Design a protein with these regions (language model features):
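Alpha-helical bundle regulatory/interaction domains
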Residues: 1-189, 199-203, 218-222, 227-238, ...
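DNA major-groove recognition helix of helix-turn-helix
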Residues: 196, 208, 246-248, 259
Length: 273
């Protein structure tokens, strides 16, 4: 299996965490959960011009998209097929970083995925064609980076308040309050929530819950046993029961089940339970 990443240069780096590519991705399990991170991605299937997201309640049902799709601001896990990930390339945005590339408020992509051509028109298909014609993986990264730079140049500017709030929430998601942030930036709580939702896809409260969930996953990564009460305390949960409730809300499984079935990819878990 080939797994490559590419960190873009400024000014793209402040919006995009990294570009990634998989070739020959195979797993024993047929489907897996993709857990919410508070971030958006562009995913381009290079194997065929089609992508699928499966229904959480009935995994025999699915939504079909063109080969290039935008995975929006998800607060619940998604179900994907591992067989369809054999040759893919993607863009992993920073929290709020996708906004200038969407041509719409990020809140309109809350808990949905859409074909990239719904946002970029025929440019999405042209991008996929260019990636398929590229002679090397590095060339693919360079093509993707140039297209993103072009989109950034024509995209909407970001509100300074959203960037400030994201820095506060990323540093201490369990300690920073909406009231304290809105007071510091000079916006009413209602206006602040709207600005934050437009740029990240989430309300501040939901975003902070997802970040706490991600902090918990970091503490669980690679471990065979965990003191759940300590994880709950370290991540700012009121108690262990609140931690387990949030974990199930975002992942659909208990923390103990996740621990047994975790993979090398923290946010990808075999579909069980």
């Amino acid at each position: 299996m080939v797994h490559l990443t590419h960190v873009p240069r400024p000014p793209l780096a402040q919006f995009v965490n990294l570009l990634w590519l998989y070739e020959g991705y195979t797993q024993q399990h047929a489907k897996e959960r993709v857990l919410p991170t508070g971030e958006m991605q562009i995913v381009i299937n290079l194997q065929e011009d089609r992508s699928w997201i499966y229904d959480r309640e009935d995994t025999d049902r699915c939504q079909s998209f063109r080969g290039a799709l935008v995975s929006g601001a998800h607060s619940q896990y998604q179900v994907i097929s591992t067989a369809e990930q054999a040759s893919i390339i993607g863009v992993h945005f920073r929290p709020g970083g996708a906004f200038p590339f969407l041509r719409m408020p990020a809140g309109e992509l809350r808990d949905v995925s859409v074909s990239l051509d719904a946002l970029w028109g025929r440019g999405a298909g042209e991008l996929r064609d260019r990636l398929l014609e590229a002679e090397s993986h590095q060339t693919r990264f360079e093509i993707l980076e140039r297209v993103l730079l072009d989109e950034l140049a024509r995209g909407c500017g970001r509100h300074a308040a959203a960037g400030f709030a994201l820095r506060q929430f990323m540093a201490a998601p369990h300690m920073t309050t909406i009231a304290s942030v809105s007071e510091q930036i000079g916006l009413s709580p209602k206006r602040f929530i709207q600005v934050f939702r437009d740029e990240t896809g989430f309300t501040p409260k939901v975003f902070c819950r997802i970040r706490r969930f991600q902090q918990a996953l970091e503490r669980m990564e690679g471990r065979k046993s965990v003191q759940w009460a300590q994880v709950a305390l370290d991540c700012g949960y009121f108690d262990q029961a609140h931690f387990i409730h949030d974990f199930r809300a975002f992942s659909g499984i208990n923390p103990s089940t996740y621990l047994v079935h975790q993979t090398l990819h923290r946010n990808h878990v075999p579909l069980v339970g």
